Swiss-Prot record:
UniProt gene name: dxr
GO biological process: isopentenyl diphosphate biosynthetic process, methylerythritol 4-phosphate pathway involved in terpenoid biosynthetic process
Protein name: 1-deoxy-D-xylulose 5-phosphate reductoisomerase
Binding residues for NADPH: 11-14, 38-39, 125, 127, 208
Recorded catalytic activity of this chain's protein: 2-C-methyl-D-erythritol 4-phosphate + NADP(+) = 1-deoxy-D-xylulose 5-phosphate + NADPH + H(+)
Cofactor: Mg(2+); Mn(2+)
Source domain of life: Bacteria
Residues annotated for 1-deoxy-D-xylulose 5-phosphate binding in this entry: 126, 152-153, 179, 202, 215, 220-221, 224
Known EC number: 1.1.1.267
Classification via Pfam families: DXP_redisom_C, DXP_reductoisom, DXPR_C
Amino acid sequence: MQKRLTLLGSTGSIGDSTLDVVARHPERFSVYALTAHRNGDKLVEQCLRFAPEVAVVGDAATAAHVEAKLRAAGSKTTVLYGPQALVDVSASDGCDTVVAAIVGAAGLAPSLAAARAGKRILLANKESLVMSGGIFMDAVRDHGAILLPVDSEHNAIFQCMPRDENEHGGISKIILTASGGPFRTREPATLADVTPDEACKHPNWVMGRKISVDSATMMNKGLEVIEAHWIFGLPGERIDVLIHPQSVIHSLVSYRDGSVLAQLGNPDMRTPIAHALAFPERVDAGVDQLDLAQIAQLSFEKPDYARFPCLALALKALEEGGIASAALNAANEVAVEAFLERRIGFMAIAATVDAVLNALPNRSPNGLDDVLAADADARRLAAGFIAKAPAPRVERIV
């Protein structure tokens, strides 16, 4: 039976990759809704190609622009805007599958709506679990939703996991791999001089600017550890991080008998997306087959927490529980935005997050409102710290 998709964040890198896979299998997948924030022109192009029933954008002005262009082209796609519209298309009877690819906290409400509507959720928005892991997973279980991870690391672990629920099938630990980003071998003393363009030059993956910076700080890997904790139900001490510069092994599962299962593939997000879209079947993702002889060498090393303090901060937040992870995520989003706008230096990202975690009293959230309040408090504190931070030492355009 053909799957009907709502694609949240269709104009981003995950959205592009998802639509590439969808286009290869029109007999399997059709598009009910596409959403974007302000990239209206790209959304129009996608709507004209995939003919969704609904398109959602962030504001009225973008909606008017998109609707005018669609009507001029003869499209009948309905154009909506605003946060509630995102929630509505995620819970709509018009779709059975929701690809949650909105970056950041903005993706929480529609992802949670999809869970409460019992949808099949392909989760690329790790912030939903980082901010409200217990609430989100309860919604998945209580409403019969199906959660399939799209992040390459979590999808790799999912593929290496046993399909039964018996004590996780004898699992000892799971191991998330990380490329180490563009600054893995750079002298730590020079990191204060990093520019946004340098931070966004990932050695292996094609990603958006925010997640590229998160990869450079390794905050992305820290968020993925928190995400893995909630998806797979393992404590932080049974989730390891391993630097693997080639990005060929996407993650590993270590079993009690000494066996280690790994998922390998070329670094292309279409592979985990195609796996999740078609699961439990397999379909062509348009990705070249892996040639290990050509790669010749795979290397590994432990992460340097002094070089990557954001990773240490994320692990600490997971250990502390409560609202710490939500505060971590919010402070990081504000700090990364400030860095990309050249208002703070690269190392000030970790300093801002650390300051917020120290300033905000931890507490156990009683519900989503508490999580959102913690998010708002952390953003306010982060903005205050950034306003007092010194300007970047170097302003280079690379």
